[in-house]
Amino acid sequence: MSSVSVNHRHEILLLPRHKRNTQTVIAGESAAIDEAVAKFAEMGKRAVKLAVSAAFHTKLMAGAAEKFKGEIAGFPFKAPNCDFYSNLYGRKLDDFSDMPSYLAAHICSPVKFVDELSAMQSAGIEAYVELGPGKVLTGLVKKFDRGANAMHIENAETLEKALAALKG
């Protein structure tokens, strides 16, 4: 465990995400992040500043979350036809009655990725598929469980590979 003190001139430095048992993402004002990264380096700890456009998953995004919620308020959401696991709550999601609030909360709330994976593993989930560009989450799943059947889909080629792997 590490403890880092940063200068109090920065208003916000939060620990919003637990990606895996050995990795925590800090978020907040850019200057506070820079100072924390420097402090970790002084301690001989690895710290990498992520290239992100905003302080997602922190209260700094509350205004954007409210605006987003208003924009999607009239969208006709439907409950999925399969189990849906939430990294907002770290468990299976059963209540789909207020999806605008749920989705807006993702913008300014911590991500409980390890809790979500633990819940999925406990439920007997055996395959994990990441949709979209890149393989960040696929890699994190494999670090969480080295034997996990984790794959990503970002185009027609990777879709074919994933379907073949899922069919066995």
Question: Residue ranges of each PLM-predicted region?
Answer:
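Alpha/beta catalytic cores of group-transfer enzymes, especially the acyltransferase/condensing modules
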Residues: 1-110, 163-166
